Swiss-Prot record:
The chain crosses the membrane at residues 262-282, 351-371, 621-641, 654-675, 686-706, 731-751, 760-783, 833-853, 1098-1118, 1125-1145, 1151-1171, 1195-1215, 1224-1244. This is NPC intracellular cholesterol transporter 1. Residues 283-350, 642-653, 707-730, 784-832, 1119-1124, 1172-1194, 1245-1278 are cytoplasmic. Glycans are attached at residues 70, 122, 135, 158, 185, 222, 452, 459, 478, 524, 557, 572, 598, 916, 931, 961, 968, 1064, 1072. Interacts (via the second lumenal domain) with NPC2. Interacts with TMEM97; the interaction may decrease NPC1 availability to the cell. Interacts with TIM1. Interacts with SLC38A9; this interaction inhibits cholesterol-mediated mTORC1 activation via its sterol transport activity. (Microbial infection) Interacts with ebolavirus glycoprotein. Changing residue 518 to W: In NPC1; decreased affinity for NPC2; decreased cholesterol transfer from NPC2 to NPC1. It comes from Homo sapiens.
Length: 1278
């Protein structure tokens, strides 16, 4: 039974109809010319024919699956050669992923040569053709249907969709699909490759996609390879960069730090609010406890000043002196005697002192003939030894300076958007206003006019052609112009090119534009126009660089055109640089004067910022002059003390005020001159800030000295020189304390590496010290002469004229301001009920300032550095509003890496076989997280493109077999042979000598339709070839772009993240500790590096300044530790409150504001040191009395000297045209004066009345002995 069933089954199988796939062709050989050098294939319906042996190499190279048996195929050798030629472009871009290219070869090999063509190819249109050689009539295949399995098409697309094109920072399919890579899919890619309009296919092939038989046709559905699979035993899978499957999960950025909150509120606010409430509770609790205690045992601690008592020592002061008291008293006495003798000498010998002062001033100021003013922004903002500056120098030396940029951003405000209707069908496409054909023609006219601008330098004519960046020079000398009009080769005729008839426009500039923004490197668009997209300079014009204001990637919605003219920059070649600057000057003048009502233009040139900074300085000179004039006028009038109208011209001190001002200015000139001698250049900050600072210090000292004399009464038998010497002995220690502490603080501030702070600190420290020296020498002598003039009743200024005799002598007198401070202000401020209110208010303000301390913005808005009326302000606004690409960034691998070994190559490259943590791969990974890393695109990789270029399957790398010279792919010469053999070894990457042999050829090869991988345009400057002891690769770079950067925070974060990436690359390459490393470079890094450490720099500079002030104060007060602590604490409060004002007033932290903070530290010394010292040396009985005396005597001089002087000058700065003056000078100067005045004249006296140091016992005893028996009133008691 079993045997019978088996036999029956065999019989049924034999009888069952079977489908037999016979081998049959649809074509064989090539026939007539389709167009250009493209030919039709000849129709042929017979069996496949044996391939001639001279075609064996080709079929092994292209279609090794057919190389078996007698190699019978449906193609001849000529067809195979055509197939190879047509595959050159895909080969260059897709062969970096072997499985992708394997599937593509499968598609074309089956189409061209398969012995079973008739199963999946259907000829749909033919025409007769007469062979001109044999006169035989043949048939051209004009149209064809190709039945392709849908699963095969999808698998091929999936294997290729991630493949990168390193030279264009884009996906390879974006260049091969006729669409943007994101819009490409399996079907439209294959349709595009088979469309004759793509410039490569000789005739139309219509693909039909199906996984099932259709109309008796069996779709070609060969096995495919995934991109994570190897195509053979020796070839690796595709790299992570070209195959996302290999990469594993996409890296995720770390989550942003959660805001620090308490109960949902900002933690700093909550903490400071609780702290302040706790302080108030403790403080007022203690206050009321003490108040109740005092009510029980005492009447009040407060007693008014009795100016008839030289000192007042209560019982508690009769105790023993501490160990430091004698030292302090001795030091105080030494300083008093020294300055007393010196003052007497200066008054007795005015001619000698003034003469030598003038000699000193002349000698120092003469250095100004060597003055150099730094206006280069790089020198202003970046220290020569900073990391960014050193990296810039390295980049400039090895690759040349980053090109100079001339850029226009153009809008069409009067033009509406329009709708384009594609032919024959398709959704309507909106086009933005600047993409109107008439606007484009006008913009092209403007662009051509700019190209024709000429400038004159050294009696020579300079044109754009002389200075522009021409990457293919000398083969192609066209300038690089990044403009949408370069899609039309900067030609009016190409822009007007259209195809159509009387009824329809089939293709015009809209069609070409939509194609070029998807494939900017294309040499032939797929429309009927067949115009190239490649720029005339030989490179692609990426749409995100030339269009602005669009949404997502809808470039057709652009609302702005961006035109960029890169100009060569020069390293240490001043003449060439000045030629470029001369042309830029004419460019700026041209665009400024260009008139076109249809266009609104924002523009910049490389020199624009420097030019506008210089113009800003010139434009604000008038404002600054008025500011100083007001201060000078006030000083001159306020120094005098008029007692009657008759003596107005006698008692005025205009001449003395002018002399004091000239001394201040002379000290500034001396400082500038001394440092000019040693070659230290000036900066704009020094010129603008130091006169203000020195005037503050100098005027304060002048008022203290003059008013101390005015309140003093000459003792019986005392001469003028003795009186002035005694007055100087009383006030000069205070002047010395403030000036010397500021000098030391500023000089220590010069330890900062920030150029602005470093330079300012040096100049300021020396200027303040010289000012003090001139004041205790020259000014004392001048004061003595002025007093003699006054005593002789001679008029001020007109000293030869005598005034009317009134019988009165020059007597001690008190000004109205002094009387106000003495009789009204001081008693009111120091009343028992007022002092706690003052403390509570000031601590409250301090608490608020601490709460917002971490909220002050960091950076400097570029537009703020420009005048209000500058064209650059509009340009900066346009950048943030319209631009879609950030600055280019170069990841530089320093000289020292071995590129010739497989290990060294794998550490760098991003293609097949490269490490998953290679340099290129890590930058590629960073671009996937662009919102976090601020890296916008995959990097262009010269080494990956070189490996694709040198492959033996490619027609790119060929040499003359006789001369061994390089043959470009466009050269047709039988002597040109492939560089490397088509063997398994030849298909591997070149190593050792081969690597270096062919690399120079790659770097000199220009791209062309047969080889788009030539590296001349893209990489000629990216690779240093070192000659000498064997040719080797030196420093190289890998370029990409940052994302759009708009704010200072964006720029700072971009720099920080780029350095983090480079550091990680250096570490994973294992070259930490080597002589070379990877670092990022972009043109803006030198300007924003300071902000990476600005907080640390601020803490360091202000901390050093406070430390210096503390030490100097403690020493000069005779080891009065507690006085120094109180004074420095008050100055620290001023600084913290400055940050509060900065937050409230929108002032960011940067080098300019840091200089002002350092200066505010110095000015605060002026407000605080005199009060503190007056309190310390006062002999009154209680702290309240001593605080009142100090405030009465010194407060009025400080208020009239520094506060009123500066306030008048500052108000004028509010009217400056410069935004930087308005924000960083007017606002900060006003804040530092108001905060300094309120803390020095309100808070500090109150604080001293609570916790000030006790009376120096040794000094008290000495004072009592010194004035025992005298009846003279002492208004100032030191």
């Amino acid at each position: 039974m079993t045997a019978r069933g088996l036999a029956l089954g065999l019989l049924l199988l034999l009888l069952c109809p079977a489908q037999v796939f016979s081998q049959s062709c649809v074509w064989y050989g090539e026939c007539g010319i389709a167009y250009g050098d493209k030919r039709y294939n000849c129709e042929y319906s017979g069996p496949p024919k044996p391939l001639p042996k001279d075609g064996y190499d080709l079929v092994q190279e292209l279609c090794p699956g057919f190389f078996f048996g007698n190699v019978s195929l449906c193609c001849d050798v000529r067809q195979l050669q055509t197939l190879k030629d047509n595959l050159q472009l895909p080969l260059q871009f897709l062969s970096r992923c072997p499985s992708c290219f394997y599937n593509l070869l499968n598609l074309f090999c089956e189409l061209t040569c398969s012995p079973r063509q008739s199963q999946f190819l259907n000829v749909t249109a033919t025409e007769d053709y007469v062979d001109p050689v044999t006169n035989q009539t043949k048939t051209n295949v004009k149209e064809l249907q190709y039945y392709v399995g849908q699963s095969f098409a999808n698998a091929m697309y999936n294997a290729c969709r991630d493949v990168e094109a390193p030279s264009s920072n884009d996906k390879a399919l974006g260049l091969l699909c006729g669409k943007d890579a994101d819009a490409c899919n399996a079907t439209n890619w294959i349709e595009y490759m088979f469309n004759k309009d793509n410039g490569q296919a000789p005739f139309t092939i219509t693909p039909v996609f199906s996984d099932f038989p259709v109309h008796g046709m069996e779709p070609m559905n060969n096995a495919t390879k995934g991109c994570d699979e190897s195509v053979d035993e020796v070839t690796a899978p595709c790299s992570c960069q070209d195959c996302s499957i290999v990469c594993g999960p996409k890296p995720q950025p770390p989550p942003p730090p959660a805001p620090w909150t308490i109960l949902g509120l900002d933690a700093m606010y909550v903490i400071m609010w609780i702290t302040y409430m706790a302080f108030l509770l403790v403080f007022f609790g203690a206050f009321f406890a003490v108040w109740c205690y005092r009510k029980r045992y005492f009447v009040s601690e407060y007693t008014p000043i009795d100016s008839n008592i030289a000192f007042s020592v209560n019982a508690s002061d009769k105790g023993e002196a501490s160990c430091c008291d004698p030292v302090s008293a001795a030091f105080e006495g030494c300083l008093r005697r020294l300055f007393t003798r010196w003052g007497s000498f200066c008054v007795r010998n005015p001619g000698c002192v003034i003469f030598f002062s003038l000699v000193f001033i002349t000698a120092c100021s003469s250095g100004l003939v060597f003055v150099r003013v730094t206006t280069n922004p790089v020198d202003l903002w970046s220290a020569p030894s900073s990391q960014a500056r050193l990296e810039k120098e390295y980049f400039d030396q090895h690759f040349g300076p980053f090109f100079r940029t001339e850029q226009l951003i153009i809008r069409a405000p009067l033009t509406d958007k329009h709708i384009y209707q594609p032919y024959p069908s398709g959704a309507d496409v909106p086009f933005g206003p600047p993409l109107d054909i008439q606007i484009l023609h006008q913009v092209l006219d403007l662009q051509i006019a700019i190209e024709n601008i000429t400038a004159s330098y050294d009696n020579e004519t300079v044109t754009l052609q002389d200075i522009c960046l021409a990457p293919l020079s000398p083969y192609n000398t066209n300038c690089t112009i990044l403009s949408v009009l370069n899609y039309f080769q900067n030609s009016h005729s190409v822009l007007d090119h259209k195809k159509g008839d009387d009824f329809f426009v089939y293709a015009d500039y809209h069609t070409h534009f939509l194609y070029c923004v998807r494939a900017p490197a294309s040499l032939n668009d797929t429309s009927l126009l067949h115009d190239p997209c490649l720029g005339t300079f030989g490179g692609p014009v990426f749409p995100w660089l030339v269009l602005g204001g669009y949404d997502d990637q809808n470039y057709n919605n652009a609302t702005a055109l961006v035109i960029t003219f890169p100009v060569n920059n020069y390293y240490n070649d001043t003449e060439k640089l000045q030629r470029a600057q001369a042309w830029e000057k004419e460019f700026i003048n041209f665009v400024k004067n260009y008139k076109n009502p249809n266009l609104t233009i924002s523009f910049t040139a490389e020199r624009s910022i420097e030019d506008e900074l210089n113009r800003e300085s010139d434009s604000d000179v008038f404002t600054v002059v008025i500011s100083y004039a007001i201060m000078f006028l006030y000083i001159s009038l306020a120094l005098g003390h008029m007692k009657s109208c008759r003596r107005l011209l006698v008692d005025s001190k205009v001449s003395l005020g002018i002399a004091g001002i000239l001394i201040v200015l002379s000290s500034v000139a001396c400082s500038l001159g001394v440092f000019s001698y040693i070659g230290l250049p000036l900066t704009l900050i020094v010129i603008e800030v130091i006169p203000f600072l020195v005037l503050a210090v100098g005027v304060d000292n002048i008022f203290i000295l003059v008013q101390a004399y005015q309140r003093d009464e000459r003792l019986q038998g005392e001469t003028l020189d003795q009186q002035l010497g005694r007055v100087l002995g009383e006030v000069a220690p205070s002047m010395f304390l403030s000036s010397f502490s500021e000098t030391v603080a500023f000089f220590l501030g010069a330890l900062s590496v920030m150029p602005a702070v470093h330079t300012f600190s040096l100049f300021a420290g020396l200027a303040v010290f010289i000012d003090f020296l001139l004041q205790i020498t020259c000014f004392v002598s001048l004061l003595g002469l002025d007093i003699k003039r006054q005593e002789k009743n001679r008029l001020d200024i007109f000293c030869c004229v005598r005034g009317a005799e009134d019988g009165t002598s020059v007597q001690a007198s008190e000004s109205c301001l002094f009387r106000f401070f003495k009789n009204s202000y001081s008693p009111l401020l120091l009343k028992d009920w007022m002092r706690p209110i003052v403390i509570a208010i000031f601590v409250g303000v301090l608490s608020f300032s601490i709460a917002v301390l971490n909220k002050v913005d960091i950076g400097l808005d570029q537009s703020l550095s420009m005048p209000d009326d500058s064209y650059m302000v509009d340009y900066f606004k346009s950048i943030s509003q319209y631009l879609h690409a950030g600055p280019p960034v170069y990841f530089v691998l320093e000289e020292g890496h071995d590129y010739t070994s497989s290990k060294g190559q794998n550490m760098v490259c991003g293609g097949m076989g490269c490490n998953n943590d290679s340099l290129v791969q890590q930058i590629f990974n960073a671009a996937q997280l662009d919102n976090y890393t601020r890296i916008g695109f995959a990097p262009s990789s010269w080494i990956d493109d070189y490996f694709d270029w040198v492959k033996p399957q490619s027609s790119c790398c060929r040499v003359d077999n006789i001369t061994d010279q390089f043959c470009n792919a466009s050269v047709v010469d039988p002597a040109c042979v492939r560089c490397r053999p088509l063997t398994p070894e030849g298909k591997q990457r070149p190593q050792g000598g081969d690597f270096m042999r062919f690399l120079p050829m790659f770097l000199s090869d220009n791209p062309n339709p047969k080889c788009g991988k030539g590296g001349h345009a893209a990489y000629s400057s990216a690779v240093n070839i070192l000659l000498g002891h064997g040719t080797r690769v030196g420093a190289t770079y890998f370029m990409t772009y940052h994302t759009v950067l708009q704010t200072s925070a964006d720029f700072i974060d971009a720099l920080k993240k780029a350095r983090l990436i480079a550091s990680n690359v250096t570490e994973t390459m294992g070259i930490n500790g080597s002589a070379y490393r990877v670092f990022p470079y972009s043109v803006f890094y030198v300007f924003y590096e300071q902000y990476l450490t600005i907080i640390d720099d601020t803490i360091f500079n202000l901390g050093v300044s406070l430390g210096a002030i503390f030490l100097v104060t403690m020493v000069l007060l005779g080891c009065e530790l507690w006085s120094a602590v109180i004074m420095c604490a008050t100055i620290a409060m001023v600084l913290v409150n400055m940050f509060g004002v900065m937050w409230l007033w929108g002032i960011s932290l940067n080098a300019v504001s840091l200089v002002n903070l350092v200066m505010s530290c110095g000015i605060s010394v002026e407000f605080c040191s005199h009060i503190t010292r007056a309190f310390t040396v006062s002999m009154k009985g209680s702290r309240v009395e001593r605080a009142e005396e100090a405030l009465a005597h010194m407060g009025s001089s400080v208020f009239s000297g520094i506060t009123l002087t500066k306030f008048g000058g500052i108000v004028v700065l509010a009217f400056a045209k410069s935004q930087i003056f308005q924000i960083f000078y007017f606002r900060m100067y006003l804040a530092m004066v108001l905060l300094g005045a309120t803390h020095g004249l309100i808070f500090l006296p109150v604080l001293l009345s609570y916790i000030g140091p006790s009376v120096n016992k040794a000094k008290s005893c000495a004072t009592e002995e010194r004035y025992k028996g005298t009846e003279r009133e002492r208004l100032l008691n030191f």
